[in-house]
Amino acid sequence: MKCPFCNHLHDKVVDSRESKEGDAIRRRRECLECTRRYTTYERIDEVPYMVVKKDGRREKFDRQKVLGGLLKACEKRPVSMAKLSELVNRVEYKVSDSPDREISTIDIGEYLMENLRELDKIAYVRFASVYRDFQDEQAFFNELKHLMRQKMS
């Protein structure tokens, strides 16, 4: 590493420890030329997760946005915050697991509906009504019939 005082390229690490926040490694270095000491921080280069919208736009993955949609669907339902948080964690893991760190809103919506169907049927229907953008009561009724058929089999 280049010394900030004399621009010499060789140094030695005198001390190394985790930062107070735990998100970096703090290193004390000593220049082998001028013997002055300086501090460097080593951090993970975080590439943000991206969500590909239906119109092709990309925006940063927002955990709170996903959780907010789930909270609305589960309002006044017996679904714990821990379960919802776990579900958002699984979505986040799916994004981080993809090689390009991207996921489409379609994949997120389908994954959430699949999991909500198991968690709480009413929350599932509420979420589906917004996600699938039902235009009339017939579309809503068809989704309920589909859900009932799945329950019977």
UniProtKB/Swiss-Prot annotation:
Its cofactor is Zn(2+). Keywords: ATP-binding, DNA-binding, Metal-binding, Nucleotide-binding, Repressor, Transcription, Transcription regulation, Zinc, Zinc-finger. It holds the Pfam family Zn_ribbon_NrdR. A zinc finger (unnamed) spans 3-34. One of its GO terms (biological process) is negative regulation of DNA-templated transcription. Disulfide bonds: none annotated. The keyword Hydrolase does not apply. Residues 49-139 form the ATP-cone domain. PROSITE patterns: ATP_CONE. Binds 1 zinc ion. The keyword ATP-binding applies. InterPro entries: ATP-cone_dom, NrdR-like_N, RNR_NrdR-like. It comes from the Bacteria. One of its GO terms (molecular function) is DNA binding. Belongs to the NrdR family. Negatively regulates transcription of bacterial ribonucleotide reductase nrd genes and operons by binding to NrdR-boxes. NCBIfam families: transcriptional regulator NrdR (TIGR00244). HAMAP family: NrdR. This is Transcriptional repressor NrdR. It comes from Solibacter usitatus (strain Ellin6076).
